[in-house]
Amino acid sequence: MSVFRDDFLWGGACAANQFEGAWDVDGKGPSVPDMCTNGSHTSPKWVTTGIRPDRLYPSHEAIDFYHHYEEDIALFAEMGFKTFRTSINWTRIFPNGWETEPNEKGLEFYDRVFDCCKKHGIEPLVTISHYELPYALVEKYNGWASRELIGFYMNYCKTIFERYKDKVKYWLTFNEINAGMMAFGQVLSTGTVQGYEGPAMGAPDDPQTRLQALHHQFVASAQAIIYAHAHYPQFKMGCMLAYGQSYAMTCDPDDQLANQQSMNEHNWYCGDVHVRGEYPYFAKRLWKELGVEIRMEPEDAETLKKGVVDFYTFSYYMTSCVTTHKDVEGIGGNLLGGVKNPYLKASDWGWQIDPKGLRYALNEIYGRYQIPLMVVENGLGAYDEKGEDGVVHDSYRIDYLRSHIEQMAEAVKDGVDLMGYTPWGCIDLVSASTGEMAKRYGFIYVNKFDDGTGDLSREKKDSFYWYKKVIATNGEDLA
């Protein structure tokens, strides 16, 4: 008998900007990712202030889900998906972000997507803002640095809540909101890069602006949750964090303290606001050490307290080690920083693979918050090559996912309330961090390459059939 609950939400996850394409079709405006060029593991993608004719912008076509959604959702249904995590592209609904009236053609597209999901018995799990900030809001307001964006976000939320109230039950307010705790989050998450052109992960850091922007996102999230709970009691509202599990490198007390502070900053700062409705006890010292002063309106504290989430979701790909010692090798490709763990292997992109770390993380999060959890991103980005038979034999991906599902099962036995699992990039898509197609996660291979070529045909990998069996047995048969 499976340890996972009978209504466990098995599925997969994607983001609008990474797979929809059709970037300027049917009234859609440009979002921040539409201004990002392609890149690779060794060459950073750039954000530009205008579209350069000599550069390739992978989100413009991506894998063209916009015109392939029926085919793709049918493939998800063939695997047996119970849920599909996707996002709504803000600029399909409000091209600049500040309009009062929505773009009807954009709304109709998501009607079709959600209707197709329902036809196949798939429950949509919708991220309201998944790194898809309207670029016009960056140009005019410096993104979330301006409190004005709370009102624009609320208008967007009210529009999609009312439109899809009978089609979507599960909502996430922001994707990986704790990206705002890190310098790389300024482009994709907070959008606080007005006038900046350069490497997308290398914008000059301004902690004051970044953390003020994050506060505005917290208030916007809370307002959206309060509104949803008041008007649509059937909705379940969640948060989403990039969970950064780390370990102290040694038993040196300095390493232990450094790791504790890293966990506080990367995970609990945002998690506490979302789940407990207030900034954690350590926030004031953190602000002081960063030279930050958060401007808050008198009503913000009450808003945060009332606008707490119903469930907590997170991405989990890797772990890292933290040390105060200077003679230790860092981790390549790990956005959260840290140093190498000698006990772990790494992916082609240098991300250290740690299945037991997922069990550890689930226990840490559940022990702190005691609300239902969901792993909404997990997976192995790899260079997939077709065999002589024309099929991708991705046993390495199956091994990765199997080992992580095994540890999720152990966490459930530990007593963790786990409601679902949606591996990332269930169909190959554009990488958010590097802007490349070569970093493939999917159960479904898409014939699209980094130079923009490819006929966009879809083909099942070995992992497709394996995951279908996992879902059919509710996680019992992992062979």
What is the predicted role of each segment?
Residues 1-53, 77, 96-98, 107-479:
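Active-site region of glycoside hydrolase catalytic domains
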Residues 54-68, 145-147:
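Active-site mouth loops of central-metabolism enzymes
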Residues 64, 68-89, 123, 306-312:
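Catalytic domains of carbohydrate-active enzymes, especially glycoside hydrolases
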Residues 82, 91-93, 131-133:
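A short acidic, glycine/proline-enriched capping/turn motif at secondary-structure boundaries
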